[in-house]
Amino acid sequence: MTRALLVVDVQNEYFSGLLPITHPQGHLTNILRVMDAAAAQAIPRVVVQHTFPQPDKPFFQRGTPQWELHPEVRGRPHDLLIEKNLPGSFTGTALEAWLRQQRIDTVVIAGYMTHMCCDTTARQAVHRGFKVEFLSDATGTLPLNNSAGQVSAEELQRAILCAQQMLLSEVISTEAWCRRITQRTQARMRAALGQ
């Protein structure tokens, strides 16, 4: 299994803008933790940044402070930066070609929003033959209230995670994922040493 971590849309809009992420607690801390764990295990990190090209959209406008990556993400090393204009990170980007070139077979989903760009990107990955590990507490969402109804952030997060686990992704916590990648590296080292 050869992984790449996709850090989806961790932009200021979700912290100080119009779309504040409210659930789960610790979402940013967990995103940073998986970025650091991936770096320590030489797992490639792909940072995805959303841009709306339409000037009438009230958020994700290139060049605005809210469009910028969160400083903690921007300050960490990554292997590829992808800019996208639609919810799916594969649409209109070089992501798939880069993953194939790197011989990646598994993508790990972290970032925002669970119900929109993370969910869409995970589904696109499955349709392209990739395995998906969907980080349950390193993704995040917010409550919705629109003409179709309303749903709390907790309910929305739980529903998407349950749907992902059904036939699409392996839903896994940050703690379990970090332990998994560390154990696999240790096992490979022991095998190389003939232990």
Each PLM stretch: what is its role?
Residues 13-16:
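Short acidic, Gly/Ser-rich segments with clustered Asp/Glu that frequently serve as metal-coordination loops
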